[in-house]
Amino acid sequence: MFNKFKEKLGSFKKALSKTIDEKAVEVEPVVVEQMPQSEESLEEEIEPIVEEEALEAALEAESSEAETEAASPAIAHVPIEDLKKAEYRKKLKDLKKVGEKKVEEEKPPEEKKSFFKKVVPKVGFAQKAKALVFNREVYLDNKDLEEPLWELEMGLLESDLALSVSEAIVESVKNQLTGTTKRIGSNTGEIVEAALKKAILEVVSANTFDFDEYVKNREKPVHIVFVGINGTGKTTSISKITNRLLKSGYSVVLAAGDTFRAGAIDQLGIHANRLGVKMIKHQAGADPAAVIYDAVQYAKAHKIDFVLSDTAGRMHTNMNLMAQMEKICRVSTPDLIIFVDEAVAGNDAVERAAQFNEAVPIDGSILTKIDADAKGGAAISIAYITGKPILFFGIGQGYEDLKKFDPEWFVDQLFNQ
């Protein structure tokens, strides 16, 4: 998915990364002091040092005591304080013996170490772990970005992005990267990719809203009209939305409003039978506004939650069919008008969406065949050009093959290898 678009982005990243590498300069390493993380770690570090100091003091005290006893006669009256000191020295001496015994048991036979050699290597409370973080910094001006940004714009246009969308993305990347000093690590591609992701995310996130929350809070029945040209997956998208609503516990009735195309009523009827929902229809050639009106009245009478109306495929230049669409919207006011087109149609789909939006304002789009789209132009451009969000992606022929649009997920797909 989006393989050709990924190639174009990859070329830009490579070109700009080279420029950044050439201009990047080393900066002084940052010294990061890592203090102990918790009280437990403090206790673990303090314990060996305290134990070591206590044993050293005990040994020193014993040595001086022995010298004193050898040089002086026995003293008959010993002060209480001295008795306490003697008792303390005895406890420390016992502690030393226990410590040495424990260490001897833990050591392998071929490698004997003293108790002090065992505890000294441990990190003490007064010691700090220091790490050096080496960074580089780079300052980019307009001249540095001139050639890479030109390549980016050409790549976007070749990927079927609308000119205004390409310009918006290029301008965003330029504003993010020029005029400020940025710290970078060893991977210069990260700074470039981050700027690109942010720029594209801004474009595809235009006026997004949650379809599920929106319809949940609308007064029932909710009326949704689907528009677009023939052969783009409009009827299939209606069946997928029907399946989604049924899975959410709603009731649905379909309106066979495409009375212009031969076989359209039968095609929608097949989906209605498979999904187990009612379809309201008239004979071929009937007034589609009357069919859709009857479907809405049926939903009200039977307390149906949703009316999904199919319409004849039409171009905005077909004045009769556009007048028909205006009549449908006037007779049975829709809560949502959804434009359906193929992602693989690229910039053509974007132009059609813009033209429909001018004639009969749409509320959002469904792009079908997104799994077969190598360029990604329509998916990136359509929300920006119309000012109306992408609601769903069609990703296959099954009823479950409908992906709710998530801007961040979509941008990740553009960069995933």
From Swiss-Prot:
EC numbers: 3.6.5.4
GO BP: protein targeting; SRP-dependent cotranslational protein targeting to membrane
GO molecular function: ATP hydrolysis activity; GTP binding; GTPase activity; signal recognition particle binding
Keywords: Cell membrane, Cytoplasm, GTP-binding, Hydrolase, Membrane, Nucleotide-binding, Receptor
Pfam families, alphabetized: SRP54, SRP54_N
Xref: SUPFAM superfamilies: Domain of the SRP/SRP receptor G-proteins, P-loop containing nucleoside triphosphate hydrolases
Residue stretches in coiled coil: none
Reaction(s) catalysed (UniProt annotation): GTP + H2O = GDP + phosphate + H(+)
Keyword Nucleotide-binding: yes
UniProt-listed PANTHER family: SIGNAL RECOGNITION PARTICLE RECEPTOR SUBUNIT ALPHA
Record's protein name: Signal recognition particle receptor FtsY
Organism name: Methanosarcina acetivorans (strain ATCC 35395 / DSM 2834 / JCM 12185 / C2A)
